[in-house]
């Protein structure tokens, strides 16, 4: 039985209001030129590609929006339940007979950090969103499934949202099943610092975790830029520093230039403290 795959693709930094969709199984694109989630769509420019009239399956022959840079150091994570990888989550939203997908990271007892443009794929109903922490592939979800309960968008322009999820069928909270990630206070984050972006890119087999390795190239306000490659589906991926602390949430990129995340500065940290009682910021 064929499935349709939708994914979010593009949001230009010059016009933060425009978000484009790409197909979910393979496209998780980033912001500035591309939004790197597989979810949601408001940009009509890509609708003819991703509309429900198209039956899109994962395939090496399909094209998808991406920001692949000269540094394309990406590798699959197989030990997804070990260390800081445990909190990295695959996000899935059924839509138009197919689905959209993105990435996120567990940061509290019930809370996931991801992008606004990812959760917007649920069309206002958080229960349409399912979260699979530590997913290995589409047939192996070692830490099960959690369903969205509430969406809390960041009040500023930055592409950041908290997704609060309900306990699972065993009445366990997501933060009990996996260890929530630690947030960096970012007091020591610097240009040329080594970082990784870990999530579920759409050009790889569905729901497989991949890590991109690179360096910080710019820090300003609520934006962090880096020289590593990402693809649609990476939207919402955590950006980790060398201590495996989250310093940003990936959202998009500019072709042939850089990829970007929401930088967790003092204002973002206060937003997290106000909405996540057990947030761990160090």
From Swiss-Prot:
The Enzyme Commission number assigned here is 3.4.21.19
Query: Could you state one GO biological process linked to this protein?
Result: proteolysis
Keywords, comma-separated and alphabetical: Hydrolase, Protease, Secreted, Serine protease, Signal, Virulence, Zymogen
Q: Which Pfam family would be a valid example here?
A: Trypsin_2
Q: Where in the cell is it found?
A: Secreted
* Any one Gene Ontology cellular component term annotated for this protein: extracellular region
Top class in the EC scheme: hydrolase
User: Which InterPro entries would you find in this protein's record?
Assistant: Glutamyl_endopeptidase, Peptidase_S1_PA, Peptidase_S1_PA_chymotrypsin, Peptidase_S1B, Peptidase_S1B_tx, V8_ser_AS
Record-level Gene Ontology MF annotations: serine-type endopeptidase activity
Q: Which N-terminal stretch is annotated as signal sequence?
A: 1-27
Q: Where is the active site?
A: 117 (charge relay system), 159 (charge relay system), 235 (charge relay system)
Which reaction equations make up its catalytic activity?
A: Preferential cleavage: Glu-|-Xaa, Asp-|-Xaa
Respond yes or no to whether keyword Secreted is given for this record: yes
The UniProt function text for this chain reads:
Exhibits a significant hydrolytic activity for the carbonyl side of glutamic acid. Shows activity toward human fibronectin and type 1 collagen.
Q: What is this protein called?
A: Glutamyl endopeptidase
Supply the source organism for this entry: Staphylococcus epidermidis (strain ATCC 35984 / DSM 28319 / BCRC 17069 / CCUG 31568 / BM 3577 / RP62A)
